[in-house]
Amino acid sequence: MWWGTAIEAPDPGALARFYSALLGTPIGHEEPGTAILAAPEGAISIVFQKAAGYQAPVWPPADGAQRPMMHFDFQVGDLDSAVAEALDLGASLAEHQPQDHVRVLIDPAGHPFCLCRDDG
């Protein structure tokens, strides 16, 4: 049995490969329409599922546009190098940055996610 959070994407395998590289977590399972990052026993898996008619969310949220349903927050030690790595892997930096110790990025499928500096 596994527990997970499912994220919709136009190409689940590609998005799983992005997060696999970003997090250093291998892909545990992949089949047409679904990819799952391997999770240590007892941890929550991240599941990527193909969605017909997928529409990427807009950040920041805007009236009449697809709103983000959820987002990931990842704690990092060195914010600048973590952002540079995410950009090299295919993320983009969001224009709207609401906090100094957090960077909002957009993954290759258009989902916002945050890299949060670990201030101890």
Please give the residue ranges for each predicted region.
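N-terminal beta-strand motif that seeds the catalytic metal site of vicinal oxygen chelate
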Residues: 1-17, 69-76, 116-120
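Vicinal oxygen chelate
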Residues: 1, 25-71, 83-108, 118-120
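Amphipathic alpha-helical segments
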Residues: 11-26, 86-88
